[in-house]
Amino acid sequence: MMKRIFWHIFFLTIFLTILYLPVINRIKAVPPGKTYTKVHRIFEDYYYYLSVIRQGRGNWAEVDQYTTEKTNPSRVHLFYLFLGKIARITGISDSDAYYGAITVSLIIFYFYTCRLIRLLLPEKWMIPTLLIIYLAAPLPDFTFYLFDKKITTTYGWWTNTDIYHRLSLIPHHFFTGALLIGTVFYFILYLRQKKIKPAIICGLITGTANLFFAVPGFIFLVSVIAACIIFPAIIYLSAIKPLKKNKIQVFFNRQILTGLIIILALSVLTQAFVYLQLKLLGHPWSDNLIWEYNTYHAERFPYQFFIFLSSYGILPYLMIILFVNTILKPTFEKIFLLLIGMMPTILYLLSAGGILTINKIRFVYGAPYVFGGIAAIMAIRLIIGKFHNKLIPALFLFLLFLPNTFISLKNYRERDVKITNYNNNEFIPTIYFEAADFLNGNTEEFSNVLIPFNIGTLLPAYTHNKVYIGHEVSTADFWGKYALSNRFFYEKDMNRDEVQKILGNNRIEYVFWDSGPLPEIYSEFMAPVFRKEHIVIYKTKI
């Protein structure tokens, strides 16, 4: 027992260190006159989620603060509204609630990973499996040509499979990924016990996950349906004729079918609820799925499938061994495990091919290293079983994983731990927060502010105002507005009619100016109400 506790503490300490070391390093190095906002991953998304947490302190619905258009309040980001309630009750800051959610998700992720390993593998394989799941890494960067096409394998900003990003996913992605592992655990437990209780728990967990982020639940749902089709097909094609019908009937008995109906019903209903939420809430949510799909479709991001595949490192190649074994000795468990490990890749290809209108890069969220790592260990056990000397293949496979782990940790140090730029969206001049305090104390809630894009991403996280532009997904005609914003603030070439139009059509009440001298034409439409160094906030006269 003490040995097991030691290893759990050991692993969690390593994981939490990897998660928080970049943050601690930056807290210690904040330049004078600047504030470190603890930006996590993509700064636009981070500030957006902070704005929802901020609203969640007092509301059960969010107003889109990243557009000046009229939008319906929504509960699309229900996870962050919950975090807002927790932050209000506990008295912690929005960013602390955000990082607290990552920490809790990491612990749940680890807990269900251990339970799933213990369910599927002998106890002695626990530590090797954890090492592969958490320390294996994507393939290193390299480029080659295939039929005159340049193919690059590297970890992309969207794959999330390098060591650091695997342990610090965006909170709702991480939390639902952790619940996905719990869902798989109870699903396999149900298959073994043939009792309804694990099936109900499985359905409730996947249903809960769907309400927060539907992609992991969708991967699970499709994997279960595919396994229910593929398993009897393999049995029918491979079994001795008198046993075919009997073997299929024994597995799909009344108890199994009842549990499957419960699991699938809860999963489908919650998936449908989330989809209807997006469709019924109006802009921008009703167009979100199509916008994402069109933006990240294959023509705009060609050949990324190779990056997606290489992001799994050597795991897919070990899974091939288990795949062959499963064809020869099929069981529903092995088929399902292979499917849920491979399903993100299959769905990615369906999306890239135009068959499935869901953003293809969404399918990185499915805990692939957990299922792939367990499948890899199963394959390794098969390999080792063929040798009289067990040490040689074990050592070979260990050395196979080691270089990638070393490269990934080196990349983590260079890309994430080291500070390479102090003039970015992490270290914000403190005067911008003084301007935010002014807006909070002197403007009406959800009043519209015209602001440059780079500051528009930040402001809603710290004020109650709506901004003209700040996030690609949250406003109509983003690129058109982006061009107009650049003309207004940086090119400063708008005539009187254009200034009146951008202020009037968007019901702009305040202008946040940090772009040097104000053009004379602009001054006809606004008057200063706040001034601090190079920042001026104007009240419009429209």
What spans do the regions from the language model cover?
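Active-site lumenal/periplasmic loops and adjacent helix-entry segments of GT-C-fold
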Residues: T17-I181, T208, F212-F218, N424-E426, ...
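Transmembrane catalytic cores of multi-pass membrane glycosyltransferases
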Residues: L211-L338, T345, I355-I358
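Membrane-interface transmembrane helices that cradle and orient dolichyl/undecaprenyl
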Residues: F175-P198, I235-S238
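Hydrophobic/aromatic-rich transmembrane helices and adjacent perimembrane loops
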Residues: F218-S223, T357-G385, F396
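Membrane-interface alpha helices of multi-pass inner-membrane proteins
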Residues: F185-Y186, P198-P216
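Start-transfer (signal-anchor) and selected internal transmembrane alpha helices
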Residues: M1-V30, K124-L130, Q255-I262, A394-L397
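Signature aromatic-anchored transmembrane alpha helix within multi-pass, membrane-resident enzymes
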Residues: R254-V268, R381-R413
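Extracytoplasmic
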Residues: Y46-Y47, T331, P403-I542
